[in-house]
Amino acid sequence: MKVTLFVTCLVDMFETNVGKATVEVLERLGCEIEFPEAQVCCGQPAYNSGHVESAKEAMKHMIETFEDAEYIVTPSGSCATMFHEYPHVFKDDPKWAARAQKVADKTYELTQFIVDVLKVTDVGASLKGTATMHKSCHMTRMLGVKEAPGILLSNVKGLTVKELPNVQNCCGFGGTFSVKMTPISEQMVDEKVDSVMETGADYLIGADCGCLLNIGGRIERLGKKVRVMHIAEVLNSRS
């Protein structure tokens, strides 16, 4: 099975280990990975900021880059959600509507792909300790991926997963929201960190680097002793 990896901007610039872990997990599950070097941003920051025409140019480039893929997989629920928004963005454009739908139909977040397409619930990972998981807004509410991460984490040997209090609450990142509405964003992430600390977990796990950078940055500034891990890194662990 051929998988075309959309690595995302944040993974490319800040969390390269997440990209490496994603590739290693998928290869271990029998996938052949392709990486189009022409890939750029999915267009979400510009689109959410109201720069629709600029965003469309990025989206068109991504459609051209990925439309011949068998499966498109990304370690980001948020960016996968943006791919699924492409048909809406181009619904009135006869040249791009069908091509946008074609790309959206074969785009998956990593855990969604493993559980729903590969039909795998145990990737053979092991990690000792306790963990809690932040469920990102775009991934759960817009993409509709709610169960797959928990299913995979429940089968990580040595790992005990504790429910995060107020798990439905946003961490305050929201892309450009954290820049435009900084005081509100700071209050939200403080509340999220309080919830994480309440669990007493060794690890905070998430499936979106934006959320993890936001929460992890706050945890570090506050001097808390919690390790922040992307779920791809957890699924690639053998400890």
Curated annotation (Swiss-Prot):
InterPro entries: Cys_rich_dom (IPR004017), LutA (IPR022822)
Domain of life where this protein originates: Bacteria
GO cellular component: cytosol
GO molecular function, a single term: oxidoreductase activity
GO BP annotations, alphabetical order: lactate metabolic process
Pfam family, one: CCG
Function as written in the Swiss-Prot or TrEMBL entry: Is involved in L-lactate degradation and allows cells to grow with lactate as the sole carbon source.
Stated family: Belongs to the LutA/YkgE family.
Name this polypeptide is given: Lactate utilization protein A
Originating organism: Bacillus cytotoxicus (strain DSM 22905 / CIP 110041 / 391-98 / NVH 391-98)
Native organism taxonomy: Bacteria, Bacillati, Bacillota, Bacilli, Bacillales
Gene (UniProt): lutA
